Amino acid sequence: AGGNGGWLWGNGGNGGSGAPGQAGGAGGAAGLIGNGGAGGAGGQGLPFEAGANGGAGGAGGWLFGNGGAGGNGGIGGAGTNLAIGGHGGNGGNAGLIGAGGTGGAGGTGGGEPSAGASGGNGGNGGNGGLLIGNSGDGGAAGNGAGISQNGPASGFGGNGGHAGTTGLIGNGGNGGAGGAGGDVSADFGGVGFGGQGGNGGAGGLLYGNGGAGGNGGAAGSPGSVTAFGGNGGSGGSGGNGGNALIGNAGAGGSAGAGGNGASAGTAGGSGGDGGKGGNGGSVGLIGNGGNGGNGGNGGAGSLFNGAPGFGGPGGSGGASLLGPPGLAGTNGADG
């Protein structure tokens, strides 16, 4: 772990990166004035083991300073579909004045040729200063691993991290994007679904804009197969936009598209459904309501009776007391 900064002044040290199978070190905290250290990256997973998690970012100074960024999660190891990607570390919190740290990204899933592991989740953003400061963005999620041989399924995409909270004055951070589901390039095997986008942070209690929700991850698709037409996976939902009191609310994230069904000699695969768009944030007093995110498109059905996937619904627009409401997101098209 990184060392702490001086009691009066000084930045916290950065955490070290983890060796294979070991978590990243946490960032050191600052004292009265200074920035928190960044968390170290998690190591790649050993064979048959998950990727290690990223270290958390250190806290910013009690009076002034930004929180450190969270470390990224490690890639999952080989040999099993339980070898998920490591989760990203959370961003450090600010003290009285300062911005929260960004959450670390999730690691890509590991696995084996016939069974893919899911991606790791993104870390949550750190909280902004109690008085003034923006909250940190959520980290992006890791993608699920694909498979190249016949087996159970490919990996699911991880979920994006949520933005941190703000204090009195500040803008909410954006939610992290969901990871994509793994593809299948074999005769049969289930495909991974897309992960959900993280929620945007709310604006400050007195003033500030809400953050946007993260986009949902796209679903995996089966490849060109001959024995059995695999179904496309469902797209991930978009995150919700952050609310605001005085300021503009955040927009909802767009959803991921459903995967296409694969063609086959006897029975074609069905397309996956698109995810739901995130809802726009609402405004309590003055400002624009957030627009809803768009729904994901449905995947196409294959030849030989493969059914198309349904498009996902768009998110609703946010309301505003003394301002225009947000627009609803468009519905995704059917496959």
Residue positions per predicted region:
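Long, compositionally biased tandem-repeat segments
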Residues: 1-335
